[in-house]
Amino acid sequence: TRGQPGNAVVVFMHDRPRRYLRERFRYAPDVPKPCLIPRMFTERELMAAFRQEQHQKLRREAGKLDQIALLSRCVRELAEPDTELCMQLAKTDDAGFFPWGVRLADLLEECFTQGLTPEDMLYTEGEVAPFGAALLGSLGKIFRRYRDALIESDLTTPGFDAFVVASALEEGTAGDDLPPLPDFLAGRAILLAGFGMLTGTENTLFRYLWRHGAQVFLHVDPALAENGQGHWACTEQSNWIADWKADTVLACPSPGKKPK
């Protein structure tokens, strides 16, 4: 940042490192005061900021009960007469649907977070309860209807924000051209710190930022930077580096301790 920390953007996995970094700037004797500190995001906040850049209309975050109510409506709309799903729904009410709605909401949120569009899972009878088998048999259709219903209702979830952002970036980077950074990141040094394993949507977003010059800081075995052969516990990070075909540089001296 050439002595201008306010020109940096730092992205953390959660809020705790941000609090520590703020305290570091506040009390460090070697930091001149007053100064502008870096703009800091958690991964979730960054996804929401990208979503807001892509879609200016504000959307309310759906809580768990909102998600379940919306899913109940979607499932009932999809339950055609004489299908297993329709017959199972006929045997239950909203209270009976609720525990299945919780599981279904969690499953679809995980699909959103990983950037996956599931298909119908057939022939699960005997493996799960009959109602669960009926839901899984229509999983792909439920996912697509739920996705559309969130948009129609001006609702979102953290996973859906990530799904929309990653989908737009994948579409924009399909060719050779790299979409420009949004205004709130343009011209800033971008640092990604504290991540170990990436979800599918994080991988899409962070790789886009990395191609724009973002630096990634990993707290791992120094051997990954020295010879690429790190401790087995760093397998995920090693695969990450290999997948991106990224160069590595040791950011600070090795402590000299060998991992067990």
Which residues fall in each region the model found?
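Nucleic acid-machinery interaction/catalytic patches
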Residues: 1-260
